[in-house]
């Protein structure tokens, strides 16, 4: 064998061994992952990707391998992404739906959760730093699975199937995976906590909010997007709901079997659904950047958000109140966003012609 080929083979074997050891450290074992659906995504330690599978009522932790590179490398831009996804997956472009995206901190690779085809199938797709797309093989990958013991039963109703919202968003924080979604019971809106590696069953907390646009307290409104952060020294969840209250929850209050009412720090307008949220700092101030279904991309100030006493009166007529924000007119059509580094984000945006494009942007 040529010396360069031998060295390459040795390098591949070494990389494989490192991956196997790293995966074993987190309790991951090789095997086939059979996704019934692929929804919310979040990265944890050592390039481990968490995938919410609402249909199966489960969370997967999947080793994605390569951890070399940097999220702050050259900007990643892929025009006509929807057409390229369709070609990669062998389906019509109209039958491709991106459910979420996440940026791998160690390498800068972008991962997408996909619903593709008719009937639809779940898939994961990675995009490398040079823009190359690849379907993530799940045939024999180190992974671990955690069950949602209290996932809602499937039942199609006026507001859709609650099972589809068993997992709506994920975030990894200090050895725990936080999972928002719906559960069985009379107070279905829930935040679950899984210790990772997965061992024990999740702890679950029912949550309720004052929904200013509706003028009432609700415990059935599901969290659509959230971010964990520290405000005035206290770890909190900042969560966005449909129609569009922004609510603060102290993480220390999320106790098993309890019911916690959050503080509604903003009402951002009705007939809208938050899609993704990221927290960043610019010019010494902190902000949330939030993509929405109908109200564009919002830059929300976190100034004095810890002191905000919360809204207690109705906000009618599609109005707004609470934390100040601005809508970023330069970012139309954004369907998903994720933080890339301290100064940049990755967005998926729909062009006027209907194409879905991936772009790297400066944080506004």
Question: What residues fall within each predicted segment?
Answer:
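Bacterial N-terminal signal peptides that target proteins for export
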Residues: 1-8
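Bacterial N-terminal signal peptides
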Residues: 9-17
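Short, low-complexity interaction segments enriched in Ser/Thr/Pro/Gly
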Residues: 2, 17-19
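Sequence/structural signature of beta-propeller domains
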Residues: 22-364
């Amino acid at each position: 064998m040529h010396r360069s080929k031998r060295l390459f083979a040795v390098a591949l074997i070494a990389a494989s061994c490192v991956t196997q050891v790293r995966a074993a450290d987190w309790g991951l074992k090789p095997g086939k992952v059979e996704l019934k659906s692929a929804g919310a995504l979040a990265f944890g330690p050592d390039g481990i990707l968490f995938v919410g599978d609402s249909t199966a009522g489960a969370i997967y932790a999947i080793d994605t391998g390569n951890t070399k590179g940097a999220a702050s490398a050259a900007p990643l831009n892929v025009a006509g992404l929807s057409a390229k996804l369709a070609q990669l997956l062998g389906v019509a472009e109209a039958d491709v739906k991106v459910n979420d995206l996440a940026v791998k901190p160690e390498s800068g690779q972008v991962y997408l959760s996909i619903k593709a085809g008719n009937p639809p199938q779940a898939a994961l797709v990675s995009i490398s730093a040079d823009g190359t797309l690849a379907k993530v093989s799940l045939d024999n990958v180190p992974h671990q699975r955690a069950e949602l013991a209290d996932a809602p039963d499937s039942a199609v109703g006026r507001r859709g199937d609650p099972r589809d919202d068993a997992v709506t968003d994920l975030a990894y924080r200090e050895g725990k995976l936080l999972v928002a979604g719906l559960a069985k019971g009379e107070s279905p809106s829930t935040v679950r906590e899984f210790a990772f590696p997965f061992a024990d069953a999740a702890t679950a907390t029912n949550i309720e909010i004052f929904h200013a646009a509706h003028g009432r307290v609700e415990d059935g409104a599901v969290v659509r997007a959230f971010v964990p952060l520290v405000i005035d020294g206290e770890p909190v969840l900042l969560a966005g709901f449909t129609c569009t209250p922004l609510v603060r929850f102290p993480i220390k209050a999320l106790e098993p079997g309890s019911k916690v009412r959050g503080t509604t720090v903003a009402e951002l307008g009705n007939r809208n659904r938050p899609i993704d949220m990221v927290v960043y700092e610019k010019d010494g101030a902190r902000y949330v950047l939030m993509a929405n279904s109908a109200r564009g991309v919002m830059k929300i100030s976190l100034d004095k958000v810890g002191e905000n006493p919360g809204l207690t009166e109705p906000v009618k007529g599609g109005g707004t109140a609470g934390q100040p924000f601005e809508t970023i007119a330069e970012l139309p059509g954004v369907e998903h966003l994720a933080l890339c580094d301290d100064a940049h984000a990755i967005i998926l945006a729909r062009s006027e012609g209907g194409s879905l494009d991936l772009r790297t942007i400066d944080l506004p």
